[in-house]
Design a protein with these regions (language model features):
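N-terminal capping segments
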Residues: 2-89, 180-198
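Short alpha-helical interface elements
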Residues: 61-66, 106-111, 172
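...with weaker cross-activation on analogous glycine-rich loops/strands in unrelated enzymes
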Residues: 26-31, 91-157
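Residue-level marker of intrinsically disordered, low-complexity segments enriched
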Residues: 1, 10-11, 53, 120, ...
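Short, Lys/Arg-enriched charge-dense amphipathic segments
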Residues: 67-82, 113-133, 174-175
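Active-site signature of cysteine proteases
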Residues: 142-183
């Protein structure tokens, strides 16, 4: 049975679901988008005709064009995951938030990625077209960012993304003050690199 932990941000985190390398995240007090994202850790896309009702409910909660366009969890949903994290944390969404690279306009640009930042990445589709991926920074090693995101291996999880694919680093515009735990996090380079998040 999973162990539930109530964080200082009043979020329930399923601590037993986080891999050992990332269990230190359970003790982090924020930022809010990261805490919201951790609440969904392990959420899986359903294969075939059925859809995960949690994922499709996110689209309805965001509303507008997102609810009109997003009707199945087999549609790339990294932008939808980021939208639900941002909305529930109280932040305005970029235009057309389902498009990952549009998150390159969210918040404020940063020269160095730190805990809780929104990172966008370039990816190539099967046809060779340029597309994107968006996720939340939890750390880095020499060659990769470790990111919490949706539609990473068809679920919400933490994976390694090659630094060479980075498109933009964005930080939420904090209303009061930047949380004190915003920092670079150096991690071991274990696990394979993500190659395609579609």
């Amino acid at each position: 049975m999973p162990v539930l932990t109530l964080s200082s941000a009043s979020s329930i985190i399923l601590t037993s679901k986080l891999p050992r390398q990332y269990q230190w995240l359970d003790k982090e007090p924020g930022p809010k988008m990261l805490m919201e994202g951790l609440n969904h850790y392990g959420c899986l896309e359903h294969k075939g005709k059925g859809n995960n009702p949690d994922i499709t409910k996110w689209a309805k909660e965001i509303g507008g064009k997102v609810a009109e366009v997003y009707r199945a969890d087999e549609i790339p949903w990294c932008g939808l995951f980021m939208a639900i994290c941002a909305r529930r944390a109280g932040y305005a969404l970029p235009k057309d938030p389902l498009w990952a690279l549009n998150w390159g306009t969210f918040g404020t640009g940063q020269p160095v990625a730190m805990l809780g930042d929104v990172l966008t990445f370039i990816r190539k589709t099967a046809s060779g077209a340029t597309a994107g991926h968006v996720a939340i920074y939890v750390g880095e090693d020499d060659t990769a960012y470790h990111t919490l995101g949706g539609n990473q291996s068809d679920c919400v999880c933490i994976t390694r993304m090659a630094k060479s694919r980075l498109y933009a680093i964005r930080r939420p515009q904090f209303r009061i003050a930047q949380p004190k735990n915003i920092r670079r996090v150096h991690l071991a380079s274990s696990g394979k690199l993500s190659a395609n998040e579609a």
